[in-house]
Amino acid sequence: MNSFIKAVGVGCLSLGLWCSTALAQDSWWKTAAQPYQGATIRGISESTPASKYVEQVLGPKFTQETGIKVEFEATSWDQMYDKAIKDMEANTGIYDFVYIEQDIVYTYLARNFLVDITKSLADNAKIASPDFKPENFTTFLNYFKDPKSGDVMGVPMEAFIKPYLYRKDLFDDPAIQKAYKDKTGADLKPATTHEEYTRIAKFFAEYGADKELWGTTVQASSSHPAAFYEFFESVAPTFGVYNWGIDGKTFAATEAHGGQMNSAAAKKALNYWVDLLKYAPPESTSSTWDEVAGTFAAGRAAQGLVYGENAAWIATDESKSTVVGKVGVALPPVEAGVMEAAKAGKGYIGYYDGGAFGIPHSSKNKDASLLFLQYIGQTSVQTDWALAGSRIVMNSTYDDPKIVEQDKKVSGYYTLMRDDGKLFAGAPPFPFHAQVLQVVAPFIYKAIVGEIKPDDALDQAATAAEAELVKLGYRK
């Protein structure tokens, strides 16, 4: 024991700066948290890989360092929203921090649900951590700033793109390559156009007819908003239809009034997407983002658009995935001109998803929660969190040796996100997000099950969206 203590002492002498910094850091958290010893803060989030890491790792570590207990509820996407919004509306203070998905933040800001983090820390310097620096975050942080003041309203905890995943083992198999060439006259490679993607999907659906293998995933639940999101945020942009087809100035949705929701491009996109169901596994019409990830991990699809938060575990975790070492990553296929528009900053090719933790005004433990949000916003906790959840919210994380090593195992997913993340975009800054979703989604569901044609679905959806926007006062 004495030898061990002496060794540690020598280490601290030789690395004095490091030791004093680490001890000072520990001391700061303990000192800052002293007034809140024994307090319990409660948070809620969707049960994602990144959230589970908070629940299982970061929450307990924070408690150990500060004495503040963290109760974290990781639940379903719909329950997360339902519980958090009802709590904030009723001002009951059940939750001290809530998950704010990128696409709902504008609604929360419009309804004044959230505490201004920048102002709160400026007003109480005793709980402002020197290790919490907003400038360390990627530009994804901008989605969680008040557009008027520029103040931070949420601390990013996950951010990822939705790339095109494909089975490298199938695409690289010489026998399959020959069969594809004989069948189609083309070389088998990741699709860059929608025509190529459909051709590959059809080929693998036929090839895998007796192998429990289909040609593509489709996030087409006929009763869940996941279908709305896949179409409007992942598929429609690849056809040049942005911001759900709603004009950001006039709030027109119909083509007749200057919108794009029922434009020729939008109709081509929906027909393409619905047509892919012919080559997708039977669970596709009941698949949300979770089931799509499960389908791909089970080896039931040759390709698909899969949320990046699942990329790491699908490619590396043998306890949950049957395709470890077999996953390729690429950009989604697009229509002519769309990639060029995205590179010029005039469009985008898919969804840049993610979220932050924010503090409701209804919270009864705001200061303790501010400490926790800063704790998860330290550079030092980012790398292992990224390994667990395929999420990166700070530029420095990309260069960490652990991430560089894992990047090789996930076919360059992190490199793709770093270099081409600018080609993706979050949801449009609409405070009426939920209302339009509710009136438009039913028409997408009807197209999925074949109750109405895709063209008719979008005509009716655009009309319904405009009517709702008139009702809400956005459009006259």
Where do the protein language model's features map onto the residues?
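Extracytoplasmic/periplasmic substrate-recognition and gating elements
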Residues: 150, 170, 277-281, 319-391, ...
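Long, aromatic- and glycine/proline-rich binding clefts that accommodate carbohydrate-like moieties
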Residues: 29, 327-343, 387-446, 476
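Extracytoplasmic "Venus flytrap"
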Residues: 28-29, 35-57, 78, 160, ...
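Glycine-centered hinge/linker elements that transmit conformational signals in sensory
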Residues: 196-205, 237-286, 328
